[in-house]
């Protein structure tokens, strides 16, 4: 039987673009693991994506996952938009390159071995795990140590 894992994620950016960070909490039975990292120059959407990617890439076995995010961009992108992006060789409906394609490809790879149910939660609405992820993300953004090598200024 596959492990039942809950994942909560959030991304933060001070400026957008600017210093950013992500926070994620993984829960399996009574075990909890918190993840966070800060980047010197990035965007809020990249950090929302990185939160989900980091959490999923941490798992070493196939799992049944409920992943909660306050990012409609991430939830809609991975459950809906990505199918047509892939059919169109990672182009949008108006034939422009998909933004953050490096992270979308990485997220697509990260979910393949798992069964993932994506849930949206309203941000800054008192959801305890989302608030905790927000705190982790903001703290990481306030003290960034990494370079977001995939970030491309527009």
UniProtKB/Swiss-Prot annotation:
SUPFAM superfamilies: Ribonuclease H-like (SSF53098). PROSITE patterns: RNASE_H_1. Monomer. Residues 1-142 form the RNase H type-1 domain. The keyword Cytoplasm applies. NCBIfam families: PRK00203.1. It is found in: Cytoplasm. It is an enzyme of class 3 (hydrolase). This is Ribonuclease H. Its cofactor is Mg(2+). Mg(2+) 2 binds at residues 10, 134. It comes from the Bacteria. Mg(2+) 1 binds at residues 10, 48, 70. The gene is rnhA. Belongs to the RNase H family. It comes from Pectobacterium atrosepticum (strain SCRI 1043 / ATCC BAA-672) (Erwinia carotovora subsp. atroseptica). GO terms for cellular component: cytoplasm.
